[in-house]
Amino acid sequence: MFQGASALTLDAKGRMSVPSRYREALQGQAEGRVTVTKHPDGCLLLFPRPEWEVFRAKIAALPMDAHWWRRIFLGNAMDVDLDSAGRILVSPELRMAAGLEKEVMLLGMGSHFELWDAQTYTAKEQAAMAQGMPEALKNFTF
């Protein structure tokens, strides 16, 4: 179970150091193997390989009228391995798709992660908060 936000930096080669609190879980759950793909909200999704296989099967089973969504998620997916320093390489294509340059935010989302350009994430978070809580959360007690 992944949760929490981490402000990180991509190096000149597009490598990102995975926070140590996640490395052990990724090694145990997926032998350090992850899959990275594009998300239409403007971020990247990072899945431990076993979770990716579950997600991939759901996407592959979508009806024909969702073929573009299959292309978005499956056609842009790249398998990567944690290196010996605990980093993953984010491909130039995926960095460009999500507008990632140097400063990024890694968000634990339960079974997977989202990777955002830090400025984009801050702007979208502020916009969401300005809109107020959605109906589904109005009766939710904290």
Curated annotation (Swiss-Prot):
Domain of life: Bacteria
Domain SpoVT-AbrB: 5-51, 77-120
InterPro entries in the record: MraZ, MraZ_C, MraZ_dom, MraZ_N, MraZ_sf, SpoVT-AbrB_dom, SpoVT-AbrB_sf
Molecular function GO labels: DNA-binding transcription factor activity; transcription cis-regulatory region binding
One of the record's GO cellular component terms: cytoplasm
Record's keyword terms, sorted: Cytoplasm, DNA-binding, Repeat, Transcription, Transcription regulation
Major localization listed first in the record, in broad terms: cytoplasm
Intracellular or extracellular location(s): Cytoplasm, Nucleoid
One Pfam family cited in the UniProt record for this chain: MraZ
Family: Belongs to the MraZ family.
PANTHER family: TRANSCRIPTIONAL REGULATOR MRAZ (PTHR34701:SF1)
Name used for this protein in its record: Transcriptional regulator MraZ
Lineage: Bacteria, Pseudomonadati, Pseudomonadota, Betaproteobacteria, Burkholderiales
